[in-house]
């Protein structure tokens, strides 16, 4: 089974537990912290895959390292360890945070532009496109693309809205030909 699909199942389960226990905010803080701690400490991951350590010893290491994390997060980490799926933590974190954003009516977008967009322009884009995709808020990351002549391309999920000058010229060209 695809690793992304498996991670999404764990993320969905953790999300449901967070909702049921009223700990969504706490777990939303814990998940990125765990992901970052693991990303910054490769030795810890190596230690967890060390064959001479027993499962109980590895569990003790996780409990100690993540003692400050909520119980559902600790239990998820322990379950991933037991099922030899600890490498899914980064993808699980991404999936979990996407579920939280979705529940809060937030979508992520990338705006490609020839120049840096002002805060006002980003707010205007957010307002227009949030409404288009049925979300309350659109968090936009602005990436400067020197290939663009002008205008903006906005990517939300797997959809691209082409508002670039070159895109407009291409549409005009097709209308004239066709």
From Swiss-Prot:
Keywords: ATP synthesis, Cell membrane, CF(1), Hydrogen ion transport, Ion transport, Membrane, Transport. The gene is atpH. Belongs to the ATPase delta chain family. It is found in: Cell membrane. GO terms for cellular component: plasma membrane; proton-transporting ATP synthase complex. Its main location: membrane. Signal peptide: none annotated. F-type ATPases have 2 components, F(1) - the catalytic core - and F(0) - the membrane proton channel. F(1) has five subunits: alpha(3), beta(3), gamma(1), delta(1), epsilon(1). F(0) has three main subunits: a(1), b(2) and c(10-14). The alpha and beta chains form an alternating ring which encloses part of the gamma chain. F(1) is attached to F(0) by a central stalk formed by the gamma and epsilon chains, while a peripheral stalk is formed by the delta and b chains. F(1)F(0) ATP synthase produces ATP from ADP in the presence of a proton or sodium gradient. F-type ATPases consist of two structural domains, F(1) containing the extramembraneous catalytic core and F(0) containing the membrane proton channel, linked together by a central stalk and a peripheral stalk. During catalysis, ATP synthesis in the catalytic domain of F(1) is coupled via a rotary mechanism of the central stalk subunits to proton translocation. PROSITE patterns: ATPASE_DELTA (PS00389). This is ATP synthase subunit delta. It is a peripheral membrane protein. One of its GO terms (molecular function) is proton-transporting ATP synthase activity, rotational mechanism. Pfam families: OSCP. HAMAP family: ATP_synth_delta_bact.
């Amino acid at each position: 089974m695809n690793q992304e699909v498996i991670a999404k199942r764990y993320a969905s389960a953790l999300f449901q537990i967070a909702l049921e226990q009223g700990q969504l905010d706490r777990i939303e803080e814990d998940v990125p912290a765990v992901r970052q701690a693991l990303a910054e400490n490769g030795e810890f991951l190596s230690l967890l895959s060390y064959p001479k350590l027993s499962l109980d010893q590895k569990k003790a290491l996780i409990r100690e390292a993540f003692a400050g994390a909520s119980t559902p997060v600790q239990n998820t980490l322990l379950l991933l360890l037991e099922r030899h799926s600890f490498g899914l933590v980064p993808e699980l974190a991404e999936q979990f945070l996407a579920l939280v954003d979705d529940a809060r009516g937030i979508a992520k977008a990338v705006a490609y532009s020839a120049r840096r967009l002002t805060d006002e322009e980003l707010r205007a884009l957010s307002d227009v496109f949030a409404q288009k995709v049925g979300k309350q808020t659109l968090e936009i990351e602005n990436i400067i693309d020197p290939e663009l002549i002008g205008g903006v391309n906005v990517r939300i999920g797997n959809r691209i809205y082409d508002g670039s000058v070159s895109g407009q010229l291409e549409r005009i060209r097709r209308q004239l030909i066709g």
